[in-house]
Every structure is written in structure tokens, then in C-alpha cells.
Amino acid sequence: MHLMEFPREVILGKNLVPEVNNVIKRLKLESPGLVVYGPVTKKIAGESVKKAIRDEFDVYSITVKKAHIGEVEKVEAKIRDYNIKWAIAVGGGSIIDVTKLASYRSGIPFISFPTTASHDGIASANASIRGIEAKTSIKARPPIAVIADIEVIKTAPRRYLAAGVGDVISNITAVRDWKLAHKLKGEYFSEYAAALSLMSAKMVIRDAEIIRLGNDEGVRKVIKALISSGVAMSIAGSSRPASGAEHLFSHALDLLLDKPALHGEQTGIGTIIMAYLHGINWRKIKETLKTVGAPTSAYELGIDPEIIIEALTIAHKIRPERYTILGKEGLTREAAEKAAKITGVI
């Protein structure tokens, strides 16, 4: 059986806080609800979302600090203790991922209200949580609705929008890896999911100059691409259309660094290297990332070149069952260093 789950509503526009209650009503969600936010996103939109909901529904709130299993369990306890019927995540990737997994494990729906456009988790079924073995993608359920307020997202530092491009552009190498696994290992492959995923990547490449400006149109384009990417994963029933060797590289960096860079920044650099290994146009990918202001080197990422090399050599061990261009044995130190140097990453 192949189950596909999608958000029932995706709303993209301006000043959408007042629209939250209408979404709750249309989805026939009952009180009480739970607003999940971070210390920063509480001030950006969390408090105003809670205030708006409180006008018509019983609602509680909780602050989440990081994407860690301990925070997931904290949210689960709140859901259990207060008999919460649904949750709304107001924040970036970490807040959304924690809410996503806690809601899934508690058997309740959740709404995604992103405050940044930094990665495709805003609409996908997958969550990246630390503290569960290695930090990799954990299967949950997609949000029942996505409410993307351009005015809110536009207030985030430009770095986050550029990271969103880095996450979407990684679909290029992810789909290549997926095709490789299909050809060599007989893995299930969905042409439709792959096409939608690649369309998202092509869109940000085509519109890089607009996205660079960080205006309403640029933000809208990145959000649409991220949501399409999330939907592609739902169609595939896995993260395959948007997560290949470049994501394994990013997860390896997460393990090696005390303070990793943004997820999309790391996957963007990973995509440059993996595109080189695949023999495809890595220069165009690098040019796009430069255009939108995303880092394209270890120096710009603030990471020691030695860490980049080490991450490349251990990336294949992160998810051994996921076949990619790295193969079963991974890259030798020499091969990793060569790829990173040729592409200008180090």
C-alpha cells in the first residue's frame, strides 16, 4: 500500500494572522489547541497568533528552544496533560519539526505557520530531530494546513531565504541519487514526484535574481518551491525526491559541529560537491547560490575545511540503506579533498 498525505489547505499571502481562525473552522478542529513557538518567534508572530485564536477557541502555548527529542517529549506531555486536539507551529524549521513529530506521536493534526522560508520541512511529512541516534529525517505526517504570511517571513534575516534556495536546489542531486538507486538497487521511483521536485529546483534557479531582492515576489517564489518540494516527498512516500547525498553530508556536519550552519546552507554546499561527482553542471548551482547570497565555500560557512573533508568521508554511513552517488564505501579522503577543491568549497 502506498499512502499519500497532503496539506488540506495552503494559504499564501499577507497579514494572515486573522485568517488562522477561519482555517481552524474550515478544518472543523475542536478546542483546545496548542500554539508552539520559539523564544524569538513568540515575539515575531506567536503571541499575535495565540491572541487571535483565543478570541474564538481555548488555546494553550509552549516554548520550544531546539529540534531535540527532549523538546518533542515536552510538547507531547503538554498535549497529553491538557487533552490538546490540534497544534499550530509558529516558527522556523526547528519549531515546525518538533511540533510535527510531537503531533504525529500524539495522534493529533498540526498547522504549519512558518516564520522563515529556510527549508522544505514547512510542508513535508519529515522531521529532523537531534537525540534520536544520528540526526536524520524521521517520518511523521505533513501539516493539515500551511499558512505562509509573506509579511512575517520577509522580516527574517535574508540569510534564511537564501538557505531555502539551498534546500530546494538540492533536489537536483537528490533526484539523481534516487534514479541511481532505482537503476542499481531496484528502489521504487516516482516520475511524478521527481518531476515536481526538479521543477521546484529549476524555479529557484530561473528566478534567482528576483529572489536575491528579498521582496514579496522573491519570498513568494521560494515558499512555493519549498511547498512543492514537500508535496513531492508526500507523493513519493519518502524524502527521496528532496534528500540525497547532499543531505547526508549536511547531517554529517551536524554530527561534527557544535554549532552547525543553517540546514539549507549546508545542503546547498553539499549539492555543489555532489553535482560535481554526478558529472552535472555544478557551476550553475554554485552561481545560483552566489546570486541569492548563500554561502558556497567552507570559509563563507565558517567551517574548517578539514571538517568538510571529514563530513564527506563519513556521509555514506549516516543512512546506509539510502544508496547515493557516494556508494556503499563512501569517498576516500583523497577523493573528498579533490571534489571540495575543484568546486572551490575549500
Swiss-Prot record:
**Enzyme nomenclature, EC number:** 1.1.1.261
Does the record's keyword annotation contain Nucleus? Answer: no
Q: Where in the cell is it found?
A: Cytoplasm
Q: Write down the chemical reaction(s) this protein catalyses.
A: sn-glycerol 1-phosphate + NAD(+) = dihydroxyacetone phosphate + NADH + H(+); sn-glycerol 1-phosphate + NADP(+) = dihydroxyacetone phosphate + NADPH + H(+)
Query: Where does the source fall among the domains of life?
Result: Archaea
Binding positions for Zn(2+) per the UniProt entry: 167, 247, 263
CDD domains cross-referenced by the UniProt entry: Gro1PDH (cd08173)
- Sites where the protein binds substrate: 120, 167, 251
Q: Which cofactor does it need?
A: Zn(2+)
The record's InterPro entries line, in alphabetical order, gives: G1P_dehydrogenase_arc, G1PDH, Glycerol_DH
- Which keywords does UniProt give here? Cytoplasm, Lipid biosynthesis, Lipid metabolism, Metal-binding, NAD, NADP, Oxidoreductase, Phospholipid biosynthesis, Phospholipid metabolism, Zinc
So what does this one do?
A: Catalyzes the NAD(P)H-dependent reduction of dihydroxyacetonephosphate (DHAP or glycerone phosphate) to glycerol 1-phosphate (G1P). The G1P thus generated is used as the glycerophosphate backbone of phospholipids in the cellular membranes of Archaea.
Family assignment?
Answer: Belongs to the glycerol-1-phosphate dehydrogenase family.
What's the protein called, per UniProt? Glycerol-1-phosphate dehydrogenase [NAD(P)+]
- Species this chain originates from: Pyrococcus abyssi (strain GE5 / Orsay)
By which gene is this protein encoded? egsA
